[in-house]
């Protein structure tokens, strides 16, 4: 399912900051496309993408500003190639571990092989994984134990939050793959984590895997802006 996703700069702290350069590179819905492929909506003849090309670009950008570049992903790195299917996502994490990613959130396709597999494979990542609003059903026990992280780049403290849209979770994750899990309102949890982070950081960044009914603009939907 095609989805709009948001990796957005949510807020600057009220304290005045000295001008600094910060480069944020982010991907979403890379769907295990390890090799370049024909994406007809981009080019009907020329193959595009591929993890090697992406890794090269990340390496080049980090070489320019190594102290002020951060690389993020907003989910759906699983599901879309044979190697992913055969390894249930393990090979994708292995490759992403070599590409220079710093932080990623979890999308619906990371649940395609069952949530128990999600836990097993994502635990192998050498970059941070975030998800803050999916819980074991009927409890306050989070499915993933890290809703946000604080990363420093060139003297700036960045608070990064990972969420999954509630509608998108129920609409796109097969019922048998999310059994005994529940997603809760992302706006409520966004506000909670913003309140916790703002006293500690200079900038907050949201990685959210969210469906098209949210109708977000390039700045995010109205609820996100209000938060």
Model-derived regions, located:
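Gram-negative bacterial Sec-dependent N-terminal signal peptides
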Residues: 1-19
């Amino acid at each position: 399912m095609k989805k709009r996703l948001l990796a957005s700069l949510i807020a600057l702290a009220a304290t005045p900051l000295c001008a600094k350069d910060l480069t944020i590179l982010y991907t979403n819905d890379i769907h295990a496309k390890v090799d370049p492929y024909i994406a007809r909506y981009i080019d009907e003849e020329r193959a595009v993408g591929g993890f090697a090309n992406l890794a090269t670009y990340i390496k080049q950008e980090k070489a320019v500003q190594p102290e002020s570049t951060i690389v993020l992903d907003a989910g759906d790195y699983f599901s879309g190639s044979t190697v992913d299917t055969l390894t249930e996502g393990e090979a994708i994490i292995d490759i992403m571990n070599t590409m220079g990613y710093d932080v990623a959130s979890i999308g619906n396709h990371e649940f395609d092989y069952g949530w128990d597999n999600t836990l097993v494979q994502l635990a192998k990542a050498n970059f941070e994984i975030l998800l803050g609003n999916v819980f074991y059903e009927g409890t306050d026990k989070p499915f993933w134990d890290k809703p946000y992280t604080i990363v420093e780049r060139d003297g700036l403290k960045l608070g990064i939050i990972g969420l999954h849209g509630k509608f998108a979770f129920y609409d796109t994750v097969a019922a048998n793959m999310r059994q005994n899990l529940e997603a809760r309102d992302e706006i409520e949890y966004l506000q909670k984590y913003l309140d916790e982070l703002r006293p500690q950081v200079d900038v907050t960044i949201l990685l959210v895997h969210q469906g098209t009914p949210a109708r977000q603009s390039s700045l995010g939907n109205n609820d996100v802006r209000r938060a």
